[in-house]
Amino acid sequence: MKHRIQHIHFVGVGGSGMSGIAEVLLNLGYTISGSDLNESAVTRRLAELGMRIAIGHDRANVAGAGAIVTSTAVAGDNPEVLAARAARIPVVPRAVMLAELMRLKRGIAVAGTHGKTTTTSLVASVLAAGGLDPTFVIGGRLTSAGANARLGQGEYIVVEADESDASFLNLLPVMAIVTNIDADHMDTYGHDVARLKSAFIEFTQRLPFYGSAILCADDANVREIMPFVSRPITTYGLSPDAQVCAQDVQADGTRMRFTVQRRDRDVVLPALQVELNLPGLHNVRNALAAIAVATELGVDDAAIREALAAFKGVGRRFTQWGDLPVPAAHGGGTFTLVDDYGHHPVEMAATLAAARGAWPQRRIVLAFQPHRYTRTRDCFEDFVRVLGSADGVLLTEVYAAGEAPLVAADGRALSRALRVAGKVEPVFVEDVGELPQAILDFVRDGDVVVVMGAGSISKTPALVGELA
């Protein structure tokens, strides 16, 4: 590619999936420019790295580019896309560019409805600890690296594979992880779960004959597709029949301790004692996927243990903001603030269970911003059930993400349904900008407040910290 194209322009460069690819290409020696509608910490960091970043979309931004990269979030009538097409500049989908990067190395792709970002981060961290120096492109900020991408000198590249638009079918990895399969982004699959499962089967079939499919044995939908996967399979999970299996799992505050039993066909490998610096059974499963990959690639057990014990997490994945003061008007004391990206009922339930495991004697308060009207509609009853499992709930209006409002699928409807269910009395905060103060008005000494959602609620924890 490089002998023909020197300058690549990214439309929507501030997105989590776009910025990482741009950074790796910059480090490979390409001239990279990009544009985004809004300035952010991500765009500022990319500019500091040496990219030419424009805020706002304009035809002039693509001048001199040999190709432009877009994501599915970029509309076809974007002025930069139109200018590129008029000038016969190739318009490359993000996933196609990611596939091009993977072609340069041996790819490890992590797919699944939930847990992709954390699992990808764990795989990258364990391989790095094992001296394999991987390249990685992740959908979240890996705390230890201070970035969501890095160009390594080793032969492997670890990437997050996005099923939301079926673009993961562009990738050609040599190892593929499937964490779970759940009904989300169903517009892509015609609201047909069978089509969704078929896409994951096709994803595994894109492995070479010598490749490896690392599949979660605990997920019913993943188990259903296993008979149709024709590549070598390694299973992982809490299920006793998994080849990489966690036993004697115990929560120790926000850490998990467990023993890993591993079978490589008929060979039983030595048991591995693990202390994971993440809470929750869902993160035990994520760690098992990383252990399965590391074991197959010959990473030393000591390096695996070290990486998992020292793992510093990923941005907005059970990120702890520490203990903050409760206003004196509410009795004083402190509360613990946690920030999480979860926005699907399955993810929310796993995070709340992790919080209860970490702080079993404390009140768990959930501050939640629903993400997309279609998801709220499709998962309405599941949202009511999960929200009702918290001890206190603050609920905002839906973050639309470009969607038009839907009748009976907004924040007020969720709040009413939750009130009727009778398990918890919700506080509805229509404007997410008022949520930080609402949290401080609600909390009491000893509470654990989990701020959750994939939209503008991401700004809330910092604002709570400023007000507290």
From Swiss-Prot:
GO terms for MF: ATP binding; UDP-N-acetylmuramate-L-alanine ligase activity
InterPro entries from the UniProt entry: Mur-like_cat_sf, Mur_ligase_C, Mur_ligase_C_dom_sf, Mur_ligase_cen, Mur_ligase_N, MurCDEF_pg_biosynth, UDP-N-AcMur_Ala_ligase_MurC
Pfam families for this protein: Mur_ligase (PF01225), Mur_ligase_C (PF02875), Mur_ligase_M (PF08245)
Entry binding sites for ATP: 112-118
Localization per Swiss-Prot or TrEMBL: Cytoplasm
GO biological process: cell division; cell wall organization; peptidoglycan biosynthetic process; regulation of cell shape
The keyword Membrane belongs to this UniProt entry's keyword annotation: no
EC number, UniProt record: 6.3.2.8
HAMAP family associated with the record: MurC
Similarity field: Belongs to the MurCDEF family.
Protein name as it appears in the record: UDP-N-acetylmuramate--L-alanine ligase
Species in which this protein is naturally found: Bordetella parapertussis (strain 12822 / ATCC BAA-587 / NCTC 13253)
